[in-house]
Amino acid sequence: MAESMPDSRSGDPGSKASIGRRVPAGAPEQTLPMIIIVTGTPGVGKTAVGKLLAERLGSEFLSLGDLVKTQGLHKGFDRRARSYIIDEPAVRWMLNGYLKDHREKRIVFETHSFNSILHKTHGMVAVVLRLDPLVLARRLKGRNWPKLKIWENVEAELIDLSLYDSLKVLGKRRVYEIDATGKSPGNLVREILIVLHKGKGWSMKSLPNWLEKYDPVLLSRRIL
């Protein structure tokens, strides 16, 4: 599979656009996994952390949102949800082919979900960023998101949806859970590198359950 695809924005069918961005930095950590997925509910800080992690490792950075837009891997724009309708078969074909053809590259991939688009491969791990649901609600409100969409994402965070999806695809040994609440991207990257080097994976003791802290009904009344 080619490293680049025609850029749907250019209008020139012969033009090319790299699907990823090489981030120059220091020497890669040879002991770390080759595919590091940074995932979590929209609004937890995946993009900032993923870019900084890629820079720290001298790795390539890929973002599902960017790929969908720049490569035209969507079926249109959902105005109510304010997001593109992902063409999952197209994304799955392009992304898995790219990863297969570039096994020698370390790649940091940022996405809110990957259970329906990525095949489990050797050297793949997921880092699930978590965020206090009330902090998440305030952050999304600051982005002028509709109340209903804010609640949908807060609810997903409350019930550990991103964590569940990651564990379902990769299993406990390849999933790491990090609480991003009150932490800068730099601090989160340092924490991620520590847990990846330890290589112990996920456990029930990783983080507190948000449902132990918040009553969903009371929280929804504060948001809606």
Label each PLM-derived region with a short phrase.
Residues 3, 29, 104, 167-224:
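NTP-dependent small-molecule kinase module
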Residues 38:
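Hydrophobic anchor at the beta1->P-loop junction of P-loop NTPases
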Residues 41:
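P-loop (Walker A) phosphate-binding loop of NTP-binding proteins
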Residues 46:
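Conserved lysine of the Walker
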Residues 49:
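Hydrophobic positions on the alpha1 helix immediately C-terminal to the Walker A/P-loop
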Residues 60-118, 214-218:
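ATP-dependent small-molecule kinase phosphotransfer cores
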